[in-house]
Amino acid sequence: MYGIEYTTFLIYLISIILFNYILKSITRMMDYIIYKFLLIVTIASIVVNAQNYGINLPITGSMDASYVNATKDKPFLTSTLCLYYPTEARTEINDNEWTSTLSQLFLTKGWPTGSVYFKEYDDIATFSVDPQLYCDYNIVLMRYNSSLELDMSELANLILNEWLCNPMDITLYYYQQNGQANKWIAMGQSCTIKVCPLNTQTLGIGCQTTNTRTFEEVATAEKLVITDVVDGVNHKLDVTTATCTIRNCKKLGPRENVAVIQVGGADILDITSDPTTAPQTERMMRINWKKWWQVFYTIVDYVNQIVQAMSKRSRSLNSAAFYYRV
C-alpha cells in the first residue's frame, strides 16, 4: 500500500519537474525569437531610409517668393519623372533638340539621363479625356486660359486625387450621392448631363421623369464633368452615352505623385475650397508667364523642391484604370 503511494508521488514529482523543464525551454525559445526580431527591426530602422507618407506639404503661390534654388542632396537615381506640356510649348520653342537640352540640365539637378520623360498633349480638354500618369513623379504644366478655368479646375481635381469608381446604368436605376466625397465623373468627346431629382414617391421635383427636356442641365458638350448634386436624394439622369461615359466615384484622398503647375494667370486656381479636399492643401502652384524656355528653366531649377512635396507611392492613372479604381 505504501509502495503504491510512493510510486504515485514519484510520478507526480517527475511530471512536475518535466513540465517545468518544458516550460523553461519554451520560454527560452520565445525570448530568443523576440530578441532576434527586435534586433532585426533595430538594424533595419537604422539602415532603411524610409519615406514619411503622412505629410502633404503645400506648394501654392509664386515660386519666386517661396522656394530656394538648391539641388537635393540625394539625387533620384531610381525614380522617373514625367513632364506634361501643351503642344504650344514645342511650337514656340521650335528646336528639335530642346528635350535633349533639358535632359542635360536635369542631370545637373541629380536626375540621370533617361529618367525624365517629356509628354505632350494637345489641349486641356483633350488631356482630360485620357490622362496618363505613369511615372514615379508627374508634373503637369497647364497654360492659364480664362475661358478654360472650369476645365482646368476639374482636371486638377481629377488628377490630384485618387478615386474609386463603379459603372452606372442610368437606363435602369436611379442614383444618389452619399457624402461630399461622392461625385459622378463623366468623360468623353461630348458630355451633356441632365438630372431630375426625385421625391420619396419617385416623382420628379420640378421635372417630369418621362420627359428629359424638363430635366436640369448641369453640363453641356464638355469632355470632363465632375457632377455634384444634393446628397441623399435619388436622381434620374440623362447622359449622351454615345459620346460619354459616366461613373459613380468616391474620392479616396490625394494622389501624392502628381503636381500641377499653372503657367501664367493673375491668380492660382484654388481647388482646396472644395470640402472634399482633405487636407486643405494641394500640390498646385503658379509661375509667371514669360516664354516657354523660361518656364522650363524654372522647372529645372526647382524640380527637387517640387518633388520633395510629393510621394511616388500613388497608383498610375489612365482613363481605363480610372473607371474602376485609381
From Swiss-Prot:
Residues 165-167 are annotated as: CNP motif. Belongs to the rotavirus VP7 family. It is found in: Virion; Host endoplasmic reticulum lumen. The keyword Disulfide bond applies. The lineage of its organism: Viruses, Riboviria, Orthornavirae, Duplornaviricota, Resentoviricetes. Calcium-binding protein that interacts with rotavirus cell receptors once the initial attachment by VP4 has been achieved. Rotavirus attachment and entry into the host cell probably involves multiple sequential contacts between the outer capsid proteins VP4 and VP7, and the cell receptors. Following entry into the host cell, low intracellular or intravesicular Ca(2+) concentration probably causes the calcium-stabilized VP7 trimers to dissociate from the virion. This step is probably necessary for the membrane-disrupting entry step and the release of VP4, which is locked onto the virion by VP7. Residues 237-239 are annotated as: LVD motif. This is Outer capsid glycoprotein VP7. It comes from Rotavirus A (isolate RVA/Cow/Thailand/61A/1988/G10P7[5]). Ca(2+) 2 binds at Q177, D228, V229, D231, D301. One of its GO terms (molecular function) is metal ion binding. GO terms for cellular component: host cell endoplasmic reticulum lumen; T=13 icosahedral viral capsid; viral outer capsid. Residues 253-255 are annotated as: GPR motif. The keyword Disulfide bond applies. Some rotavirus strains are neuraminidase-sensitive and require sialic acid to attach to the cell surface. Some rotavirus strains are integrin-dependent. Some rotavirus strains depend on ganglioside for their entry into the host cell. Hsp70 also seems to be involved in the entry of some strains. In group A rotaviruses, VP7 defines the G serotype. Glycans are attached at N69, N145. Homotrimer; disulfide-linked. 2 Ca(2+) ions bound at each subunit interface in the trimer hold the trimer together. Interacts with the intermediate capsid protein VP6. Interacts with the outer capsid protein VP5*. Residues 1-50 form the signal peptide.
